[in-house]
Regions:
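HotDog/MaoC-like acyl-thioester-processing domains
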Residues: 69-71, 76, 80-114
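Short beta-strand micro-motifs enriched in acidic
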Residues: 3-5, 66, 82
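Hydrophobic beta-strand-centered segment that forms part of the acyl-chain substrate-binding groove
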Residues: 43-76
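Compact, glycine-rich, soluble single-domain proteins
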Residues: 26-44, 58
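A generic structural micro-feature
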Residues: 27-28, 53-55, 71, 85-87
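Hydrophobic residues in beta-strands and at strand termini
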Residues: 15-17, 65, 111
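Catalytic strand-loop segment that frames the active site of acyl-thioester-processing enzymes
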Residues: 1-29
Length: 114
């Protein structure tokens, strides 16, 4: 599920990462997939806010891994648009499991009008 939380003005996506996305004997979600969940939330919010008229291209992304992300646990990505102009947007994102913050990220996106 993905939705706009209007009260917090943030984009929320629910994921269920499977054991197929792990390393370390199936116990930890690989960092690239963690990054992808955060990136998806940040990018989708730009698309949602533009009513599908903007395609965000991630120019730069910075992810901080705070705790290990486990498989088969509902995982929530939340994002905010910090600033958006005509051609560039800056976003922040967070990833949670069981209400525990497991990773944070920020990105710079080039906006292509479609």
């Amino acid at each position: 599920d993905a939705y706009h939380d209007k009260d917090k003005d943030e984009w929320v996506i629910e994921f269920m990462p499977s054991k197929d996305l792990t390393h370390s004997n199936g116990t930890i979600i690989q960092g690239g997939f963690v990054s992808g969940m955060i990136d998806a939330s940040m990018s989708q919010f730009i698309m949602y806010e533009s009513k599908g008229k903007a395609l965000p291209l991630t120019l730069d992304i910075d992810i901080k891994f705070l705790k290990s992300c486990k498989p088969n646990i509902k995982t929530i990505a939340k994002s905010k648009i910090i600033r958006k102009g005509k051609s560039i947007a800056f976003t922040n994102g967070e990833l949670y499991q069981d209400n525990i913050l497991v990773a944070v990220g920020s990105a710079t996106n080039k906006i292509i009008q479609i």
